[in-house]
UniProtKB/Swiss-Prot annotation:
It comes from the Bacteria. One of its GO terms (molecular function) is ATP binding. The keyword ATP-binding applies. Belongs to the RapZ-like family. This is Nucleotide-binding protein Ssed_0723. ATP binds at residues 8-15. Keywords: ATP-binding, GTP-binding, Nucleotide-binding. GTP binds at residues 56-59. PANTHER family: RNASE ADAPTER PROTEIN RAPZ.
Length: 282
């Protein structure tokens, strides 16, 4: 089992790092008290090989040696990788002032500045025990995400999952769509009696639609649009992209266009999936 522990000062980006780990397939637990780590690993044994936890100052043992002892008692088959995220006092003060969130060590008589300084002192011993120390003072969330990903994978490239989904407008539009295209203006196989019982996955329907210049031009234009903007979407740290194609009933035109687009992009570096909502619900 591979265990990644993310610690660091509050406001330095632990939640961002944890989201990266979640996107990479890790089972993530936020703010786990360290005494519960053994119990968590026992429960997850056999069900997942990738586990990530984040711990903040409230869950850290006060003594450096106690932390070392807990980590050294991990099961022999556990591969531990640890991160410590830090930022300057000035940057943390600015971040908390902008978000108006409460610092974990803030009390009624403790100022934000005092809480930030106190946390730095408490966590200083921990910062010396980790494998990777990252100063996020001058990093935005995308820079931090890329840095964590590069440490874990050796590259900043991430696999974007592209979901092509066909649907019928008469049954409602999919709420999860990032891009939505209406193909109800295309020639409709429904009006061909021999094609009506079929779907866009059947060869006679595919042959009919492939012979329509409008259909081919529309598919080509969507392909060009996506190829143009996919690199920008990737740089924005997206993990999933859903392109929905809708016709009236979700049986012929949308199914065919979705199937063709999925085939066109299946040769790319991305993971491509095709789903036909109305066919699956039939």
């Amino acid at each position: 089992m591979k265990l990644v522990m993310v610690s660091g000062r509050s406001g330095s980006g632990k939640s961002v790092a944890l989201r990266v780990l979640e996107d990479l397939g890790y089972y993530c637990v936020d703010n786990l008290p360290l005494p519960l780590m053994d119990s968590l690993l026992d429960q997850l044994k056999g069900s997942t090989e990738l586990v990530a936890i984040s711990v903040d100052v409230r869950n850290m043992p006060e003594q450096e040696k106690e932390l070392e002892k807990q980590l050294s008692n991990l099961p022999a088959d556990t591969e531990l990788l640890s991160f410590f995220l830090n930022s300057s006092d000035e940057v943390l003060l600015k971040r908390y002032s902008e978000t108006r969130r409460l610092h974990p060590l803030s009390r009624s008589k403790t100022s934000l500045k005092e809480a930030i300084e106190h946390e730095r002192i408490l966590l200083e011993p921990v910062s010396k025990l980790v494998d990777h120390y990252i100063d996020t003072s001058n990093l935005n969330i995308y820079d931090l995400s890329n840095q964590v990903r590069e440490i874990l994978l050796g590259t900043v490239d991430k696999e974007l999952v592209i979901n092509f989904e066909s649907f019928g407008f008469k049954y409602g539009m999919p709420a999860e769509a990032d891009f939505m295209f209406d193909v109800r203006f295309l020639p409709n196989p429904h009006w061909e009696p021999e094609l009506r019982p079929m779907t866009g996955l059947d060869e006679p329907v595919q042959l009919f639609l492939s012979q329509q210049p409008m259909v081919n031009k529309f598919i080509w234009q969507i392909e060009n649009l996506l190829e143009t903007w996919l690199p920008h979407l990737e740089r924005n740290n997206r993990s999933y992209l859903t392109i929905a194609i809708g016709c009236t009933g979700g049986q012929h035109r949308s199914v065919y266009v979705t199937d063709q687009l999925a085939k066109l992009f299946s040769n790319s570096k991305h993971m491509v999936k095709a789903r036909h909502r109305e066919l699956n619900n039939a």
